[in-house]
């Protein structure tokens, strides 16, 4: 049996893949475009420094950005059967988010899946697991964020679940939540508080622009942030200094 036929046979194994019924409001392009202007760092600050994925998940090259609503997949260790299945139902512009447990000893994503995703019009992919074919993936116009890379391929037939609440990069999310990503990482905005977080993020951007202007105008760090004089204490009488 050659490798190609072996792979096809593995995919034909009856897999225990479960898809949950999901219903969420699809945001219009105009609504999503507002989030394209929000950096992940600002969104995270607006959520009390929460809902930003672990730094182990990063883009495969600089300049990649994500903005779209999540479709979720949970896979078993090193198995990508459920991802293959998800690619048959996901819609244009959506972000595929994969709960892979952070395992990086087997790649669950590679060149072929990326090519299919581009054909679908996927908005991007976030994987808490490993990828491979990195050289080819970097040349593609598909935003891809992952927690590792390896030449070792995936297993098949291990099953998985689609369109369920998952944890990716230590952040809980569900289908329909807004996913944004950039060079700093990936942030998750729960759908039900998106308007509140968007407003807060826009206000923070304005605030930071004002701070930048003050710095460029020559104002000192002390004056800008109203930092009090730091008391000098003897080494034998050290105490906690409150700024």
Annotate the PLM regions:
Residues 57-60, 80-87:
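Short, charged beta->alpha transition segments
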Residues 132-149:
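Histidine/lysine/aspartate-rich catalytic loop segments that bind and position anionic ligands
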Residues 2-76, 207-221, 226-230:
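Intrinsically disordered, low-complexity regions enriched in acidic/Ser/Thr/Pro/Gln residues
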Residues 55-58, 75, 97-99, 125-129, ...:
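General beta-strand structural signal in soluble alpha/beta enzymes
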Residues 147-224:
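Acidic, glycine-rich flexible loop/linker segments
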Residues 241-243:
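Conserved small/polar residues in nucleotide/adenosyl-binding loops
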Residues 86-129:
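Extracellular/luminal Protease-associated
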């Amino acid at each position: 049996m050659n490798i190609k036929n072996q792979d096809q046979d593995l995919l034909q194994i009856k897999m225990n893949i479960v898809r949950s019924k999901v219903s969420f409001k699809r945001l219009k392009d105009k609504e999503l475009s507002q989030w394209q202007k929000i950096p992940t760092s600002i969104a995270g600050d607006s959520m009390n420094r929460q809902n930003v994925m672990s730094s182990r998940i990063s883009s495969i090259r600089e300049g990649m950005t994500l903005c779209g609503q999540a479709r979720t997949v949970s896979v078993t260790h090193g198995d990508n059967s459920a991802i293959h299945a998800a690619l048959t139902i996901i819609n244009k512009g959506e972000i595929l988010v994969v709960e892979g447990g952070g395992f990086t000893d087997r790649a669950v994503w590679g060149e072929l899946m990326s090519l299919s995703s581009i054909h679908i019009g996927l908005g991007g992919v976030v994987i808490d697991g490993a990828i491979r074919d990195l050289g080819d993936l970097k040349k593609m116009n598909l935003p891809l964020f992952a927690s590792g890379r390896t030449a070792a391929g995936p297993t098949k037939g291990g099953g998985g679940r689609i369109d369920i609440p998952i944890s990716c990069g230590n952040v809980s999310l569900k289908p329909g939540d807004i996913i944004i990503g950039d060079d700093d990482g990936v942030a998750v905005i729960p759908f039900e508080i998106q308007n509140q977080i968007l407003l807060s993020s826009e206000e923070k951007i304005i605030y930071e622009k004002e701070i930048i202007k003050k710095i460029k105008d020559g104002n000192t760090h002390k004056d800008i942030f109203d930092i009090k004089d730091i008391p000098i204490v003897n080494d034998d009488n050290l105490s906690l200094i409150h700024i």
